[in-house]
């Protein structure tokens, strides 16, 4: 009995020491760029980019496998901030950064069965509702990552452009050149 | 040292001036001789819940409720909000959404009332004797009546009347400049209701506890100046009638303060920092009605003008009257108007749908024909500087415009985009017809959108972190539970073993005893 315990402990300690030594010896330094990228990313681990969480994307981006525009919930601001620290080799020249309209999830209440699957999946707790009760989306908290759409068994959730309100509406950019051209052709 | 202008020789008070500004054709002759007439009862009344700056009011009526004139139907939500009252008696036929009286035409929460035609008053607000009332009581009465700034800014007036707690106020300026072309509703109100306005001014001066009161009127309204000079005292205050030059944008709060006191309000500061509060003429009138008669704000004076209107007029209309009914009352259009505006031609809102209602801040309805609207043909900017001369806040619009069109909004903000009043002097002055102020409106909206998205991103980050922490806590709790249960199981087993062990020996001893006993 004592011999067995002693041999197992000795084995454990020895292997543990070996593992520890190996970790020290073959330690791989995480490039600081990964951490910097991860800091800029929203950090919600929503998976909209197709990589395993924000850290996954940060690593892929540092290696040059993902464009700076990969984070859709982050939108233009995140892309611009990333383009500043991720240099050209990481794909900053992946075309002009498009202005992405912010999207939000919308629940069709007729189809919602109150299964709570979306509710559990939402990375920002933007979906509210109880079991067997119609769920709804808090628009200001929704990042449009579409995670809930994938899990909904009744396809009751769709992604929509975030509706404008009087507070968020603003005038379109005037196009003086176009006006001049049309006026001239009319004349 | 400041050199006095020649104008001071004629008007000793006029020793200050404002920067920039323009002198557009006023077109006020269209309606300046039209007496204020009362508009007949409209078929429908639509009251948006947001007719003021701040939080939306909260509806307290349901569909099919019967309401009386002056009844509270939506309650102010929070300190920066305003009550909304039923303008006439009738039935609430919907509490839903309707097109906003706004350039966007977006749907906004609206209460729709079908008037029963009896116009039956419900209980009035309790009357107040301002001579004996405390300033707080006056402000509370003004808040209860749902009065907001009626010059167009729609800032809740009661909040402004309560400023004495925070600022050392010395001066009240009553804004009767009405610098926007076409509009004459304030002019007519001063000419016809000077006594009531004077009383309202006195009440406001008392609530604010100021030392001096000025009434600023542009020099192109001689009859209004005369009327207000006749009624220049109330509640122990004597107002100084200050004739200001006819110049757009004289009616801007900060410019009026500069013109009268010579002090410039710092960027993004309030005039209250200088000890000055500015209220509109129409607001003074509404305050008079609210305090003396307990009447909430349910009607206002509106100028209906422009060459597209067959019979331009000044009307007293119920808040919530559809614009289309008002235009029909004024004889309809002479020709299909090029633009339909709410407010003045310089800063008003173009609307697409004429069924939108008049709200508390609507001072004009203008139907402008193609001849009255600016030419659309634009030419390149040659940096002539006319926009710089015209800008009343001293910006360089051509530079702002160039930066915005190059996509450098932050750079535009750095050179003062956020101080732009959107008065439109630059676009008016531009010989190349460039849409300068329109670009600034766009850029301001874009910047505030970016700001709010940034804010939202930070908030969602916080939410995600909170969720993660919660999930970890749950996992930890589960783990602890498992360990506890394991420990419990082990303890139970041990106890059982111990019990078994304890149970075993007695028979042995018993046999031993037996064995001992047998021999």
UniProtKB/Swiss-Prot annotation, chain A:
Gene that this polypeptide is encoded by:
rnfB
State the PANTHER family in the record: ION-TRANSLOCATING OXIDOREDUCTASE COMPLEX SUBUNIT B
Q: Which residues form the 4Fe-4S ferredoxin-type domain?
A: 103-132, 133-162
Record carries keyword Metal-binding: yes
Q: What's this protein's function?
A: Part of a membrane-bound complex that couples electron transfer with translocation of ions across the membrane. Required for nitrogen fixation. Involved in electron transfer to nitrogenase.
Native organism is Rhodobacter capsulatus
Q: Any idea what this protein is called?
A: Ion-translocating oxidoreductase complex subunit B
Record NCBIfam families: rnfB (TIGR01944)
Q: Where does [4Fe-4S] cluster 1 bind?
A: 46, 49, 54, 71
- What triggers or suppresses the expression of this protein? Expression is reduced under iron-limiting conditions.
Keyword annotations: 4Fe-4S, Electron transport, Iron, Iron-sulfur, Membrane, Metal-binding, Nitrogen fixation, Repeat, Translocase, Transport
Names of the cofactor(s): [4Fe-4S] cluster
Q: Which GO terms describe its biological process?
A: electron transport chain; nitrogen fixation
* Chain segments carrying region Hydrophobic: 1-23
Quaternary structure, from the entry: The complex is composed of six subunits: RnfA, RnfB, RnfC, RnfD, RnfE and RnfG.
- Specify which residues bind [4Fe-4S] cluster 3 according to the UniProt entry for this protein: 122, 142, 145, 148
Please verify whether the record's keywords include Protease: no
Cofactor note text: Binds 3 [4Fe-4S] clusters.
For [4Fe-4S] cluster 2, which residues are the binding ones?
A: 112, 115, 118, 152
A Gene Ontology molecular function term of the record: metal ion binding
From Swiss-Prot, chain B:
Which InterPro entries does the UniProt entry name for this protein? 4Fe4S_Fe-S-bd, 4Fe4S_Fe_S_CS, Ion_transpt_RnfC/RsxC, Nuo51_FMN-bd, Nuo51_FMN-bd_sf, RnfC_N, Soluble_ligand-bd
- The record's EC number reads 7.-.-.-
Q: How does it sit in the membrane?
A: Peripheral membrane protein
Its required cofactor(s), as named, are: [4Fe-4S] cluster
Name any GO cellular component annotation. Answer: plasma membrane
Residue numbers binding [4Fe-4S] cluster 2: 391, 420, 423, 426
Binding of [4Fe-4S] cluster 1, residues? 381, 384, 387, 430
Q: Where is this region: Disordered?
A: 494-519
Q: Where in the cell is it found?
A: Cellular chromatophore membrane
Transmembrane portions of the chain: none
Q: Tell me yes or no: is Transmembrane helix among this UniProt entry's keywords.
A: no
GO biological process entries: electron transport chain; nitrogen fixation
GO MF entries: 4 iron, 4 sulfur cluster binding; electron transfer activity; metal ion binding
Name the predominant localization: membrane
Q: How is the cofactor bound?
A: Binds 2 [4Fe-4S] clusters per subunit.
Q: Which domain of life is it from?
A: Bacteria
Keywords linked to the UniProt accession: 4Fe-4S, Electron transport, Iron, Iron-sulfur, Membrane, Metal-binding, Nitrogen fixation, Repeat, Translocase, Transport
> What factors induce this protein?
Expression is reduced under iron-limiting conditions.
Q: Where is the 4Fe-4S ferredoxin-type domain?
A: 372-401, 411-440
Q: Can you state the subunit structure given in the record? A: The complex is composed of six subunits: RnfA, RnfB, RnfC, RnfD, RnfE and RnfG.
- Extract the PANTHER family matched here: ION-TRANSLOCATING OXIDOREDUCTASE COMPLEX SUBUNIT C (PTHR43034:SF2)
Matching entries from NCBIfam families are given as: PRK05035.1 (NF003454), rnfC (TIGR01945)
What is its biological role? Part of a membrane-bound complex that couples electron transfer with translocation of ions across the membrane. Required for nitrogen fixation. Involved in electron transfer to nitrogenase.
Family, as annotated: Belongs to the 4Fe4S bacterial-type ferredoxin family. RnfC subfamily.
Q: What is this protein called?
A: Ion-translocating oxidoreductase complex subunit C
Q: What is the lineage of its organism?
A: Bacteria, Pseudomonadati, Pseudomonadota, Alphaproteobacteria, Rhodobacterales
Gene name tied to this protein: rnfC
């Amino acid at each position: 009995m004592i011999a067995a315990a002693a041999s197992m402990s000795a084995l454990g300690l020895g292997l543990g020491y070996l593992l520890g030594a190996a970790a020290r010896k073959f330690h791989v330094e995480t490039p600081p760029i990964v951490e910097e990228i991860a800091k800029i990313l929203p950090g919600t681990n929503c998976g909209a980019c197709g990589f395993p969480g924000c850290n996954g994307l940060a690593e892929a981006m540092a290696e040059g496998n993902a464009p700076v525009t990969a984070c859709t919930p982050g939108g233009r601001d995140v892309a611009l901030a990333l383009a500043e620290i991720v240099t050209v080799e990481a794909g900053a020249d992946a075309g002009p950064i498009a202005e992405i309209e912010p999207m939000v999830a919308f629940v069709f209440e007729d189809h919602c069965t109150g299964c709570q699957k979306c509710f559990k999946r939402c990375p920002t707790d933007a979906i509210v509702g109880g079991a067997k009760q119609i769920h709804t989306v808090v628009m200001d908290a929704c990042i449009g990552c579409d995670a809930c759409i994938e899990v909904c068994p009744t396809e009751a959730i769709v992604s929509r452009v975030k509706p404008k309100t009087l507070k968020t509406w603003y005038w379109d950019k005037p196009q003086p050149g176009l006006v001049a051209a049309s006026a001239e052709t009319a004349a | 040292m400041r050199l006095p202008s020649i104008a001071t020789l004629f008007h000793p008070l006029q020793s200050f001036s404002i920067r920039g500004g323009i002198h557009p054709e006023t077109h006020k002759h269209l309606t300046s001789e039209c007496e204020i007439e009362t508009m007949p009862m409209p078929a429908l009344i639509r009251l948006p819940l947001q007719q003021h700056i701040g939080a939306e009011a909260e509806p307290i009526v349901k569909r099919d409720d019967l309401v009386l004139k002056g009844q509270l139907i939506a309650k102010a939500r929070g300190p920066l909000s305003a009550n909304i009252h039923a303008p006439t008696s009738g039935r609430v036929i919907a509490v839903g959404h309707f097109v906003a009286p706004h350039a966007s035409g977006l749907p906004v929460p609206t209460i729709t009332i079908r008037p029963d035609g009896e116009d039956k008053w419900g209980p009035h607000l309790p009357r107040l004797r301002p001579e004996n009332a405390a300033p707080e009581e006056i402000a509370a009465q003004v808040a209860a009546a749902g009065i907001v700034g009626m010059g167009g800014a729609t800032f809740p007036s009661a909040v402004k009347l309560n400023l004495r707690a925070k600022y050392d106020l010395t001066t009240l300026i009553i804004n009767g400049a009405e610098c926007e072309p076409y509009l004459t509703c304030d002019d007519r109100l001063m000419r016809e209701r000077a006594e009531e306005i004077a009383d309202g001014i006195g009440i406001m001066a008392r609530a604010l506890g100021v030392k001096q009161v000025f009434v600023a009127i542009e020099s192109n309204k001689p009859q209004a100046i005369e009327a207000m000079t006749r009624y220049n005292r109330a509640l122990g205050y004597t107002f100084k009638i200050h004739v200001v030059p006819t110049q757009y944008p004289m009616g801007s709060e900060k410019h009026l303060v500069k013109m009268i006191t010579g002090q410039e309000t710092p960027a993004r500061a309030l005039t209250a920092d200088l000890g000055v509060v500015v209220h509109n003429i129409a607001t003074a009138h509404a305050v008079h009605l609210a305090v003396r008669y307990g009447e909430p704000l349910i009607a206002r004076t509106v100028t209906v003008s422009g060459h597209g209107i067959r019979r331009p007029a000044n009307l007293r209309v119920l808040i919530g009257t559809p614009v289309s009914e008002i235009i029909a009352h004024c004889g309809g259009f002479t020709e299909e108007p090029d633009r339909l505006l709410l407010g003045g031609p310089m800063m008003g809102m173009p609307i697409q749908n004429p069924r939108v209602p008049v709200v508390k801040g609507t001072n004009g309805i203008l139907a402008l024909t193609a001849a009255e609207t600016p030419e659309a043909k634009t030419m390149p900017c040659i940096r002539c500087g006319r926009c710089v001369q015209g800008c009343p806040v001293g910006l360089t619009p051509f530079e702002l415009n160039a930066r915005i069109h190059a996509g450098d909004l932050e750079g535009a903000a750095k050179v003062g985009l956020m101080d732009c009043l959107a008065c439109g002097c630059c676009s008016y002055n531009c010989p190349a017809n460039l849409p300068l102020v329109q670009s600034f409106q766009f850029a301001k909206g874009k910047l505030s959108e970016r700001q709010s998205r940034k804010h939202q991103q930070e908030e969602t980050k916080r939410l995600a972190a909170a969720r993660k922490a919660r999930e970890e806590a749950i996992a930890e709790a589960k783990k602890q539970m498992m360990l506890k249960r394991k420990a419990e199981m082990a303890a139970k087993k041990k106890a059982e073993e111990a019990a078994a062990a304890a149970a075993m020996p007695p028979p042995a001893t018993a046999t031993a005893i037996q064995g001992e006993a047998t021999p």
